[in-house]
A protein has these predicted regions:
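N-terminal helix-turn-helix
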Residues: 1-79
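Amphipathic alpha-helical effector-binding/dimerization core
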Residues: 65-145
Length: 145
């Protein structure tokens, strides 16, 4: 049993986390079964998320993450203001243009990549904004620890 003040919100985040972690879109029945939630609660939460475009439902009745999440991500970036500063600083120091440089933050034991300047080299790593990696498994995370 949940000790949260708002159990429905906890269920909502469980659903969103499951959809996010899945390699494929999921049906409502699968979500309810996997999370051991009542089907009616699952249905109601999914409908609420659909109306806000936090998720969308394809023609086969499967659920995907929706476009509204990009709005939140954009607003987060604006409020933090550090991504533009990061880009400006990269341009001020030309030596950095030759290297892959990431802007990251630590969040609950994970490194979250906020922005990346990629080296012009043909081979290298690509870091996408929003990707989370356990801190102990990345050089960036180890440096932060």
């Amino acid at each position: 049993m949940s000790t949260s003040a708002v159990p429905a919100l906890d269920k909502t985040f469980q659903i969103l986390d499951l959809i996010t972690a899945s390699q494929q879109p999921l049906t409502a029945a699968y979500i309810a079964k996997e999370l051991k939630l009542p089907r009616s609660s699952t249905h109601n939460i999914l409908q609420s998320l659909l109306t806000k475009h936090v998720i969308y439902k394809d023609s086969e009745g499967r659920f995907h993450l929706g476009s509204y999440l990009l709005y939140w991500a954009g607003k987060y970036e604006q409020q933090q203001g550090v991504v533009q500063l990061f880009k400006d600083l990269i341009m001020q120091y030309p030596i950095l243009l030759q290297h892959t440089v990431t802007l990251s933050k630590m969040d609950l034991g994970e490194v979250v990549f906020l922005a990346c300047h990629e080296a012009p080299a043909p081979l290298g790593f690509t870091f996408r904004a929003g990707v989370r990696v356990p801190a102990v498994f990345s050089a960036t995370g180890k440096a932060m620890l």
